[in-house]
Amino acid sequence: MTESERTESEAPAGWAAGPVREPRGRGRLFDAAVRAYLERHPEATVVALGEGLGTGFWRLDNGRLTWLTVVPPKTAAARRMLLPDGARRRTVARAVTDHAWLDAVPEPWRGVVVTAPGVLMRLPPPAVRALLVACAERFPGGVLVFDALPGRATALARRAAAAGGRWPAPRWGLDRAQLPRVACLHPGIVAVRELGPVPAVPGGAAAGGLWSRLVWRGRRVPVLRALTPLVCEVRFASATSPRAVPPGALRQR
């Protein structure tokens, strides 16, 4: 193993084992979706939007992928200091809404999986639509995985934020009944589905603990279903698919 390969595969120096442990709850759904995509496209690029100081690369690296972390410039400076770029991972200093980050994906034809945990709900609806359309046009055969709050939960979260709550108010929400509308945003979007249940923890332990199990089971109860968050995967048409549309085609109509 070369020095660069050793550095890539090992956890960041000075970090305890904790930061690279398996995530809980919804985080497992994101990891499972990435792993499933990498099984089909082992040399794909993983684009982690808003990852901050996350260490997903060390959890999911298969030795062949490329990893891009897209964060605002100030966050990017801190990440590069603590987690310097490597041969197959790089921090891109861009806001999610600055679509110049799409140009940083080196070889999209090898496959692209974009993850956006906690990201889309912080964007205004037009920015969410623009991001989905841009990815559909630029990443044929790729997928985007995101989470969202249903409309009722979004309204409650906004009230809590207005009352001085800890978390910022979400700007965009998505009900489960609205998933087909996402597929209609662009001809290059071929499927939108909710992911779940939360995958089991290796070794047979319950995934995500008691709270995650209760949340998942609560989806079967209509009242609770309207409040529980959802994790979704958007699939984009391959370049050879009859539904694939050249970049900018919709804007030219």
Regions found by a protein language model. Name each.
Residues 1-45, 51-253:
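Alpha-helical subdomain
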